């Protein structure tokens, strides 16, 4: 590294690109592809207010500017260190000069008369490593929380199923959507297929994320809090089946061994009707399928490059079509889908707003968001994450990829909606 520092001003564009890749800012490779080392160290804040640099990151280039300052400092230190080699330095003045009454005649050791020079070691900071610590132990705890909520949800569904009134006694409630659209039998299968596609896309995207530990913690915390809320709403108010087409499994009337087998079957099938594991009734308010369709889209969009607009639109279409098919199949009341969408989007936005603003991670009289019941766990999971998590990607496997494109990191702009 030191040999390279000495020649930073003479770097070629290829060397600048290599430096950007090594320092985990590959998103600047394209806009700076023709920059030399001299061009790189001459960058200012004004340059990041103009295109194309203004489109790369929402921090106005502060991270890269900080790294350039560190690079210039290291280059400056190396230059002075070279000047002290063999006990003398290079000076651009005559051997004898007078300044403030002192003689500045150069001595053998290279130090002018009346002055003392020392080399000071300035540590090179590595803010990115400290700013986004992985903390896999916390991620494991979030996974345990997710596992608990998933199991608890299946238990709640089994309990609520016993309380659902027979459809012959309590017919479906009136619903404006059902009045306007006849039931389409295969629509719910389309919903579940769309959901599986979105989950699959999110898993692939997650594998390629650089900060997958932080992001997976957020996903586990949000999705399981949503399902915990769902357990409460579907238990306190048991709605009748939305349609006469429902064929609910027989009630068990306290047979806990059969309850356990039914719970294990539901867990094994992922809670999906398409796998034949979900034939219970009562889990209507609110829709778990809508939660997954909405949340996977939100995470896909939040942590993928902005330039992949077609990818965002594809996932949005899959999500919206899936929710429409839930209603078209008459498998949920409209209120189930509306409430699920509202709660999912608000919790996602609240959580990320709090995570992206350092001041909201500290409880105070003016921080009303600190009054939510999950604030303490939130502080525990997010306290060491400093700022917005970059949309950075890397190849996670030990074997090289044949045609590896440039890595991209994007941060959401302030005015993004």
Curated annotation (Swiss-Prot):
This protein's record includes keyword Methyltransferase: no
EC number: 2.7.8.27
Enzyme category, top tier: transferase
Pfam families: PAP2_C, SAM_3
Record's protein name: Phosphatidylcholine:ceramide cholinephosphotransferase 1
UniProt family annotation: Belongs to the sphingomyelin synthase family.
Gene3D superfamilies listed in its UniProt record: Transcription Factor, Ets-1
GO BP term, pick one: sphingomyelin biosynthetic process
Intervals, Cytoplasmic compartment: 329-417
Topology within the bilayer: Multi-pass membrane protein
Keyword field: Apoptosis, Golgi apparatus, Kinase, Lipid metabolism, Membrane, Sphingolipid metabolism, Transferase, Transmembrane, Transmembrane helix
Molecular function (Gene Ontology), one example: sphingomyelin synthase activity
Principal cellular location given in the protein's record: Golgi
Function of the molecule: Major sphingomyelin synthase at the Golgi apparatus. Catalyzes the reversible transfer of phosphocholine moiety in sphingomyelin biosynthesis: in the forward reaction transfers phosphocholine head group of phosphatidylcholine (PC) on to ceramide (CER) to form ceramide phosphocholine (sphingomyelin, SM) and diacylglycerol (DAG) as by-product, and in the reverse reaction transfers phosphocholine from SM to DAG to form PC and CER. The direction of the reaction depends on the levels of CER and DAG in Golgi membranes.
Known catalytic reactions: an N-acylsphing-4-enine + a 1,2-diacyl-sn-glycero-3-phosphocholine = a sphingomyelin + a 1,2-diacyl-sn-glycerol; an N-acylsphing-4-enine + a 1,2-diacyl-sn-glycero-3-phosphoethanolamine = an N-acylsphing-4-enine 1-phosphoethanolamine + a 1,2-diacyl-sn-glycerol
Natural source organism: Gallus gallus (Chicken)
